[in-house]
From Swiss-Prot:
One of its GO terms (cellular component) is nuclear pore transmembrane ring. It comes from Saccharomyces cerevisiae (strain ATCC 204508 / S288c). Keywords: Glycoprotein, Membrane, mRNA transport, Nuclear pore complex, Nucleus, Phosphoprotein, Protein transport, Repeat, Translocation, Transmembrane, Transmembrane helix, Transport. The modification Phosphoserine is found at S45, S60. This is Nucleoporin POM152. Residues 1-48 are annotated as: Disordered.
Amino acid sequence: MEHRYNVFNDTPRGNHWMGSSVSGSPRPSYSSRPNVNTTRRFQYSDDEPAEKIRPLRSRSFKSTESNISDEKSRISERDSKDRYINGDKKVDIYSLPLISTDVLEISKQRTFAVILFLIIQCYKIYDLVILKSGLPLSGLLFKNYRFNFISKYFIIDSFFLYVLPSFNIPRLTFKPWVVYLQILAMLLLNIFISSDHEFVLISLIMTTWRKLYTKELSVTGSAINHHRIFDSSAHFKGALTIKILPENTAMFNPLHESYCLPMDTNLFKINSIDVPIRINSTEEIEYIELEYRDLYTNSVELRSLSKKDFKIIDNPKSFLKKDQSVLKSHSNDFEEGSTIRYLAVTLQDIGFYQIKKIVDSKKLNLKIHQSHLVVPYCPIASITGTGSNDRCIGDSDNVSFEIQGVPPMKLAYSKIVNGQTFSYVDSSLQPEYFESPLQSSKSKQSFTQGELNDLKWGRNQPVNINLDSSITQDGKFAYKIDKITDGLGNVVDFTSLPEELKKRYDLSYNFNVHEVPRAALEERFDPKSPTKRSIAIVFEEIKNWISDIPYVISLSYTDAQDKSKKIMNVTTDSLTKVLQADLPGSYNLEYIESKFCPGEIVGKSNVLVTMPVAPTMEVKSFPILDQCVGQVGLNFELSFTGAPPYYYNTKIYKLENGERKLYDAKRYTSEGTRNRFSYSPPKEGNYEIVFDTVSNKLFTEPIKLEPVKEYTFKTSMRVKPSASLKLHHDLKLCLGDHSSVPVALKGQGPFTLTYDIIETFSSKRKTFEIKEIKTNEYVIKTPVFTTGGDYILSLVSIKDSTGCVVGLSQPDAKIQVRRDIPSAAFNFFEPIKEAKIKHGSVTEIPLKLSGEGPFTVKFKHMDYDGNIVKEFENKFQNSYKPALKVSKEGLYQLVDIRDSSCQGNVIYRNSLYKVSFLEKPKFAIQDNHHITKVTENLFSKEEVCQGMEGTVDLALFGSPPFILEYDLMAPNGHISTKKIQVATKYASLKLPNQIPGEYITTIKAIFDGNYGESDIHFREHQSELIIKQTVHPIPDVAFADGGKTLRACAANVDQISFLEPINLKFLQGESPFSITFSVYHESTSRTDQYTIDNIDSENFSFEKLYEGMKLGNHAITIDSVVDANGCVNSLISGPRNQILVSITDAPKIHILDPSTEYCVGDYVAYQLNGVAPFMIKYEFNGIPLKSKERSSQFVRLASEPGIISITSLQDSSSQCIVDFTNPKLKSEFDDLSLNIHPIPSVTVSQGNYVTEDIREGDQAEVIFSFEGTPPFSLTYVRTEETDGKHGKRRSQVVETHKVTDIYSHEYKVITSLQGTYEAIEITDAYCFAKNDLFFNN
């Protein structure tokens, strides 16, 4: 062993052991590695005892060591040859290969290791093929072949991968964790490839194995490949190909366009259409016969077209209205030398068309490709509106669309409001309960005969869509029809038509919406008017008010005595209309209206005008006497009539020497009807005072006081009791009220006080005198004022106890008595005293208030039965646009009104207003027997089975179009939200059924033209409606021991205790079940069906399946299952769906099908009764043979014709041998003998493949020759070549013929159709052959 490590004695190439630490070496020495605690087999530590690491000894070592550094470059090259040189003085011997390189080089060691691994894997593949073939595979467990396979190769692979690192082969020595990963990977690979899944590579190997190595025992006793003994194609020889050039075909409307004829040719100047026909022929077309059916009478008419009735098309693209890509399939039609042409046929009538016949110039008929064409009237639509072209805010649009066309139709229309366009599309428009083949999602180019029997679905049907929503803004409104598409695909686009045509043919509908005018009545001063008053009607300025003029105003006038009433109607083109009040009386603003809309009176509506009186003045003079000096001046008492204040002028003259000189001139103002004016000359002398003119604010021009003499007074330079009013403001009284006025008195009482009360509007004066006033203060009680107007309380004089009477000129007290009583009423713009509002919205009820603000209005809210719900009190600062804001429905009644100073009256005829809610959109589930109402908001849909479609029909109430929003919760809890838009008042919700479980459909909200999705308040108050439907799973039942074979004896079939039980697994469904079983009897090839009811996990009368079983094998399968829910599953398949029952008896044998004639290639099958294995002896064509059968059948391949006879039979239980050669069993011997017949053959054209060309209309003869036993039955086909994938040509069967009862050995066929004629099946008196080569291709 020592010499083994002294390798330098034997080779001049240096160290060639693995593990050397040379530069360039791919593997470092273990001396340079870190110490790792692993098994020694993989890695060794430098801490091993020194004696285990021996120094290398060699005679040439020293010289070699000195040259190591020079040899590094050559050492690097030798690395590829697995030679390593170490400059160290000691080497880790445990890192060297286990097998010396002198014995086997490193590269070869690697090669052998890889070859060994591949051998293991090939053997694994061999066992895998056996496993996949279902053959026994030995291992740890006898029955579980897959476990045997996995355990076997887990041990082999693990052992190989675990031991491999021990050899220290470079590049094949792995770390322990890598080895464990390799073992795990191989284990997972073994589990994966041995599973039941199909893999392409394994399938290819299995298929190749079965094809190359599958052999079967024949009746001669030898193992023969079935495919080699019987070549079916050898019995079919020859074929005849007939060619007819060229092929003449025609196709109507090849581009599958849709056509229609306009009902009104004034709009579209079209009265005919040209439909193309695609012709594949070199000859000219002479005659075309069209079948025409009237859409309304279904009457059929054949129309003959000659050359003059159609024309040739150079460019078929001109007929294409839709996508040009459809011409790609006809791209070869336009190549040079093509025989394809296009003709155009002119059609002028609506109806159904198809080509019946086309004849060319040689009087030959062209082949017609079926294509139907329905030409209806083009769809039309119109818009109508029931209202005026000029409408007001609050009116309804009242627009309806009338559509006529072939349903189902689609309408696209636009709504334009002040230039902003809103587009809408309504699809699937059709009458209720309408059925049509056009309702399918795919377009149809041909129709069934049942659909053509009644063409009413091709007629134009009317559909109406009504839009009714309230208008909330002013401006220009327009509805336009953009496009309409019928069910056949005809599209009529109106967008490019001029506006004039759209209006003429009701394709657009326009109207204007105007704002409501508002106005109030005002009283103004007018000096030019006889009454000095004018009436002004002031309108609010609104947008585009100029377009709404003229305004119409209705005024009523009532004279002052309330005796006559006059109505005045005036118009104005401005926002303010001023009228002179020529006559006194009451002026009332009755109503206003603009050019288009009735108006609202938002402020004061009544003005009372009186006739003013010209001011007059009465002057009385009293000397001012002084007890000492006598007269010192004059006191003037001035009495005025008219409306204060008054203005008067005085001139003072001084008399000197008989001359009168103007001494002074002054202008005075009197605020009351009485005034006291004193004049004391400043100097001694005689003076003359002249009152010249008087005026007031109504009569501004001064009025001369005449006669002058009465207004001229003289005085010379020649003090006293007094009284004054303690009132610092004017009194304001309501009509019918009275008041108190305090008076302060000065002087020596008792006093006598005289005062006047004057009506300024009539100049009437009433004097009152109060005597014996003993105090210095007194309160004057005014009378009750029954007439409204301005009054003046004026103090006239006072007399004290000395009897001195002093006239008073103190300021008067002004009393303003209201002429009117405040009133309140609802301001109705229309005769209807009702407003409709949306739920959750607020509306304003306009009020009409008269009086002086602010106002306090009380009203009450009542229900429709008159019961008071609540009372309210509102305050209004003025009478400009007063309105009550309400948000609840009911009756609102005015109760009381008070203005700033007076209690008012309510006008009861206009004191009641009704507010009701617009009808909320709602829906109702249509009653039928498929849905049940559980609670008010919960419905239960009839339970269905998985895969059955169901719908819920809803009736919708409100203003269309509707939007229905609902949630759909699947059984897995997933919730999806959906919305549908419906233009009619009926909707259907489709309920899914793909997954079993409970589906919950929650209808969350419905919106219509009044209540939209933006109405959050309405959305929050909608109650949800829930529809539940349970989808039951399809029942699934399988045999607990699927694929297992049960055994029973024929004698014990009727005794249940001796029968093996048949157990079921209930995988899915609701018990009890009703299951239909099929029992296939191999011996008779007969199948019996049994239906067993009330089956569950504890109750199954399986013994019924054994009834009627005779000797032999019986396959029991489950055909269908019906569970307690009524769900049916008839698609059960797989190995778990079948079990086998073998009924055995004492050794017996009989032919499985004694009535069958056996042929070469068939399987001769005998049924064996007894306990396997069986020993069978038989003869074939006189040659004695024997076989040991381990199954219950003796099956042999009939490899050649002859007679097979059974001579004896023995089983393994009784060891009884049945000798059928015994004369006593001659009848059984004859019954068990079979004659195997040869396969019949057929040849065409003497077995040659012949091509025969004939012209159109000529005929050819096809001769079939037979071999076999008559009578013969022949099946032959005619095939033609068509284009296949990737441009390859392939044959396609166009005709199949079967001829029976041929008693001769030859059969002839006369034909004029092109194609290849060949036989595919032949039957003689006994046997049948099929050309597998033909069917496989």
